[in-house]
């Protein structure tokens, strides 16, 4: 009996304790409703975070599932063609034992890496070209600056010594022009004034009186007063001696030859042949002969203008 009572007492005690615990758990008012709800919400959020972490780990584990052989096969297919078509995607997935989505993602990532590598290569090539062009540009600019400095120096030299050179050139030009003008005058004077005749004028050797033609030729020889004056200034003494010698020879002989009469220019000589007979000794006196060959006055031969008198 005692055992039964003890057992009943223990069971009763347990029964009495159980509802109390259940009532404590079921009565949230004892700890406050708001605090309990906040605790529950925090617990749920922690569980969701743990699930998400486990999901990420599972994805990473799925990514790591590609073997080395699968990667090599995908690389070969990528080298053949980097674009993936749907039929090809399914075929590769079946051959490699992967999902089509995994194959598509791998190709997408591989294309991105390939583009970045290509951009890096292109950037390196362009950078080298830019550096070379920059170097060439700098060298050309330095050369240009040096050439400009040389040009400025040459300009200063030309401007500094240009006056003396111009003066020398002007003086040389003036001297050459003067020499040319003098030569032209020397050449033009003999051509305009006198020309050397091919043969002396023809005179009548045998005649009883003075030859009219000799006087006309003599008149033509001295047409200009200026020529006579210049001739007198140049050779006055020589002509006077020639005229005196001519008069002396006339008195000694019947046939006389006059001294050469020179005209300015030095290239023309005219000989006048005169013949005088005894009947005309008084016709030409000494004064008239001197006046005829005089250098101071031009000849005035008005007395032989009538043709009938001499004929």
UniProtKB/Swiss-Prot annotation:
Region described as Disordered: spans on this chain: 1-32, 157-183
Comp. bias (Polar residues): 1-10
Keyword Transcription regulation: yes
Gene3D superfamilies named in the record: Homeodomain-like
One Pfam family recorded for the sequence: Homeodomain
A biological process term (GO) from this entry: negative regulation of abscisic acid-activated signaling pathway
DNA-binding feature ranges: 59-118
Annotated phenotype, changing residue 67 to A: Reduced interaction with ABI1
Key words, A-Z: Abscisic acid signaling pathway, DNA-binding, Homeobox, Nucleus, Stress response, Transcription, Transcription regulation
Up-regulation conditions: By water deficit, by abscisic acid (ABA) and by salt stress. Self expression regulation.
This protein's GO CC annotations: nucleus
Cited SMART domains: HOX
Transmembrane segments: none
InterPro entries xref list: HD, HDZip_class_I_plant, Homeobox_CS, Homeodomain-like_sf, HTH_motif, Leu_zip_homeo
Superkingdom of origin organism: Eukaryota
UniProt PTM comment: Phosphorylated by PKA. Reversible inactivation of the binding to DNA by phosphorylation.
Subcellular location: Nucleus
Site (Interaction with ABI1): residue numbering on this chain: 67
UniProt entry tagged with the keyword DNA-binding: yes
Region (Interaction with ABI1): 1-43, 218-311
A GO MF term: DNA-binding transcription factor activity, RNA polymerase II-specific
Family note: Belongs to the HD-ZIP homeobox family. Class I subfamily.
PANTHER family: HOMEOBOX-LEUCINE ZIPPER PROTEIN, HOMEOBOX-LEUCINE ZIPPER PROTEIN ATHB-6
Subunit structure: Interacts with ABI1.
Role played: Transcription activator that may act as growth regulators in response to water deficit. Interacts with the core sequence 5'-CAATTATTA-3' of promoters in response to ABA and in an ABI1-dependent manner. Involved in the negative regulation of the ABA signaling pathway.
Protein name per UniProt: Homeobox-leucine zipper protein ATHB-6
Organism from which the protein derives: Arabidopsis thaliana
